[in-house]
Amino acid sequence: MNHVVIIASAQFGYHIDTYYYCKHLKHRCNVTYIGWNQGLSPVILDGIEVISVSRKGGLIRVLRLLNAIWRQTTNKNSVVFIKYFKFLSWFFRMMRPRNPMVLDIRTGSVETSSVLRFLYDTVLKIEALFFKHITVISGGLSEKLGLRNTRLLPLGAETISPADKVFDTCRMLYVGTLYNRRIETLIHGLADYHAQADTHDKKIFLTIVGDGSPGQLDGLIAIAAEQGLNDIAVFTGRVPHDQLKPIFDTHNVGISYIPLTPFFDHQPPTKTFEYLMSGMPVIATRTSANQLVITSENGVLIGDTAAEVCRGIKTMLQKPDRFSSEQIRQSCRDYEWPKIVDNLYTYLCNLK
């Protein structure tokens, strides 16, 4: 395989999985990434041809996207890797029937409306019928969607912070989307702990990195202020992935808070792995995916209520010396990105 074209709806660098595919494939073959230009700060990765397609113009933008894909896939030996592109994935397949092509599914629908979830998951399953080769993030997701003959392409992680952590305080970090995640429950749980703790025990801090739908971040900031957490909870908004290291360096506990719902249950959370690879124990909600990786040696599993968040913080602070950054990193070595992309490269080379 000499050339792979990766197609995704996200602007380059803002979808973690495809970013690391590019990073670790570029030393083995030519890599082209095609995605929307969403007006975010550009992420630069040497050795990658990035084509950012303008989203202006309604139907015209779709034609621009199709034109970019057509131009980059003229060689029938170019492998096309599509991170599921809602409503268009099937058309990409029809455009280039002779090219080896993979449909990669990272998630089912996480819409709050059951009707919309059913609709979008049905569309996904119909589009998947056009593909011979399909990769999925987890076996649970493949089973949930009723997909057969899929190849597992699990979530990976890279060490963002190599520093060994000191656990004299609890400097918690949540990184991820705020959309549909009920982060207000996390804030209420922190407030409950703060209200119960003795004055001398209030060595807790929480940084929330990410954004959601319009007005959502401001709403969470207001909730934190109402709870008297102005000196404890900090909101940074969105931070590009390649600028996260200083934040990870200064925190020692990761928060993987995902509501306990059927549509999130089999969704492996990116940040759980990144916290662990950075030597941070994790307070994680008890999803099926988190239960596969979180143990008493690298974190604590909780429910998704404020009381459970409070309990998780208490548990984390009771015996902080039981955690070792090196042991925590060792617990998830199988999920390192280089290993995962090695397997992906072998898979892509054998496509027909």
Task: List PLM regions with ranges.
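Conserved donor-binding/catalytic core segment of Leloir-type glycosyltransferases
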Residues: V5-I7, T135, A163-L190, T207
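Nucleotide-sugar-dependent
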Residues: F12, R181, D242-L244, G254-E274, ...
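Membrane-proximal helix-turn-helix segments that form the acceptor-binding/catalytic region
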Residues: K23, L66-W70, W90, L103, ...
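Donor nucleotide-sugar binding/catalytic pocket of nucleotide-sugar-dependent glycosyltransferases
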Residues: I51, D121-A163, Y174-N180, A233
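Short His-centered aromatic/hydrophobic patch
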Residues: F81-L88, I105-R106
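Glycosyltransferase donor-sugar binding loop
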Residues: F205-L220, G237-R238
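Conserved acidic donor-binding segment of nucleotide-sugar-dependent glycosyltransferases
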Residues: S296-A307, T315-D321
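A charged, aromatic-enriched C-terminal amphipathic alpha-helix characteristic of glycosyltransferases
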Residues: D304, Q318-L351
